[in-house]
Amino acid sequence: PEPLAEFFDLFYIGEGETVYDALFDAYKANKKAGGSRSDFLLKAAQIPGIYVPSLYDITYKEDGTIESFHPTCEGVPEKVEKQLIIDMDRDYNNLETPVVPHIKATQDRVTLEIQRGCIRGCRFCQAGMVYRPTRERDVEKLKESARTMLQKTGHEEISLSSLSSSDYSHLKEIVNFLIDEFRDEAVNISLPSLRI
């Protein structure tokens, strides 16, 4: 994120679900205590995965690459570690009651993330490299989530989302379940990002 450091107060390095609550709690606590922006940024920098550029001293080599990277305040980590959800069943925050717009949206469907990451490693795909390792969600939990989200939203289509949906090891099982379970409601199934 360093090329954009002058324009942002902080960056989150990793998958957002791991830090949302801690970051918002720190913000609310700082606001309630009457703390300054600097106070909040110092507290935020102590949350794993948060990079606050103003709290680091960075020097560059002649070619523009980073030569050194050091925190300027006590309590700020030497290295900002990328945060990942490793256990997609334990730590995944499934949004079972998504916002349903009052107008027809282009992507008017339930999105069910079946896995994160990709096994392919295609050189042209940044996401496939950035979101490693590949992590699957449990098929039984996916079935329950699909049932709940379709009932609560009234959508007539469900997208089985991932970087490469065809690589999900239980794809046949979840697709057959959706066909059988929602046959009477005529729910459509979308499979984006198929690699065959």
Predicted segments, located by residue:
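Structured alpha-helical segments in the cores of large, soluble enzyme domains
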Residues: 1, 20, 110-118, 142-150, ...
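Flexible loop/turn segments at secondary-structure boundaries
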Residues: 1, 20-21, 58-60, 119-123, ...
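Glycine-rich beta-alpha loop elements in corrinoid/cobalamin-binding modules
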Residues: 1-70
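Short secondary-structure boundary/capping segments
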Residues: 6-11, 27-29, 129, 173-182
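Conserved structural-core and active-site-/substrate-pathway-adjacent residues in large, well-folded domains
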Residues: 9, 50, 117-118, 122-125, ...
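N-terminal [4Fe-4S]-dependent radical SAM core
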Residues: 53, 59-111
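Canonical Radical SAM [4Fe-4S] cluster-binding loop centered on the CxxxCxxC motif
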Residues: 103-140
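Conserved SAM/AdoMet-binding glycine-rich loop
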Residues: 147-196
